[in-house]
Swiss-Prot record:
It comes from Rattus norvegicus (Rat). Its main location: membrane. Its EC number is 2.4.2.31, 3.2.2.5. The modification ADP-ribosylarginine is found at R204. This is T-cell ecto-ADP-ribosyltransferase 2. A lipid is attached at S246 (GPI-anchor amidated serine). It is a lipid-anchor; GPI-anchor.
Length: 275
């Protein structure tokens, strides 16, 4: 009997790790995502992030290459751009880098953070990008479009969020272009009040991009036809993590990471307890 129980829980845990990797994606609150807003620890993170960035470079060659490319572009466009007090070269470089080739790999790591937090090598990049949007946000709301080649399914109950940083466009034509959308995908029509218009920072200004932080929550969700989803009433923010990589958040970090690995630990302990 203990052996059967062990097998059951091991199978259950493995299923949890792969659920959602195939077929339509669930539109929910993205519980596995890394969604830190760094509330109360910005000064600490500004001190620590440069060191974290070097650590990330050592473990993530793609990020290092993308960062160096973005840094060159940022230095070229910086003199002709306006930005608020507190916005520095790190913030600008991160924002430019996101519009390049790194976004797909970065967002995958953000979405799957809870499954493997030890392999998250975008610590500083996540902070700088989050902070860039916070500094550039002026409270304006935008009506935007996002086309995907992946089908999303909404159960019809509850608020939702993307969890990851989400690119959208002021242009429906851009969102529905073959580069981003297919007949088997989903077209999102979104009202965002935390998203920031980043055309002036982008490698692709023709995309008319509005970048939405993953912690924006939409309280009204409506589906239309086969592949359109409307997201409205973005009045709340939700994060499961805060100041995870700052010394100010050391206690919270331990608790959060313990909760992340708890299911696998329970499975292993159960198996070891067999006679």
């Amino acid at each position: 009997m203990p052996s059967n129980i062990c097998k059951f829980f091991l199978t259950w845990w493995l299923i949890q790790q792969v659920t959602g990797l195939t077929g339509p994606l669930m539109l929910d609150t993205a519980p596995n995502a890394f969604d830190d807003q760094y509330e109360g620890c910005v000064n600490k993170m500004e001190e620590k992030a440069p060191l974290l960035l070097q650590e990330d470079f050592n473990m993530n060659a793609k990020l290092k290459v993308a960062w160096e490319e973005a840094k060159k572009r940022w230095n070229n466009i910086k003199p002709s751009r306006s930005y608020p007090k507190g916005f520095n070269d790190f913030h600008g470089t991160a924002l430019v880098a996101y519009t390049g080739s790194i976004a797909v790999d970065f967002n995958r790591a953000v979405r799957e953070f809870k499954e493997n937090p030890g392999q998250f090598h975008y610590k500083a990049f996540h902070y700088y990008l989050t902070r860039a949007l916070q500094l550039l946000s002026n409270g304006d709301c935008h009506s935007v479009y996002r086309g995907t080649k992946t089908r999303f399914h909404y159960t019809g109950a509850g608020s939702v969020r993307f969890g990851q940083f989400t690119s959208s466009s002021l242009s429906k034509k851009v969102a529905q272009s073959q580069e981003f959308f297919s007949d088997h995908g989903t077209l999102f029509i979104i009202k965002t009040c935390l998203g920031v218009y980043i055309k002036e920072f982008s490698f692709r200004p023709d995309q008319e991009e509005v970048l939405i932080p993953g912690y924006e929550v939409y309280q009204k969700v409506r589906t239309q036809g086969y592949n359109e989803i409307f997201l409205d009433s973005p009045k709340r923010k939700k994060s499961n993590y805060n100041c995870l990589y700052s010394s100010a958040g050391a206690r919270e970090s331990c608790v959060s990471l313990f909760l992340v690995v708890l299911p696998s630990l329970l499975v292993q302990l159960l198996c070891l307890a067999e006679p």
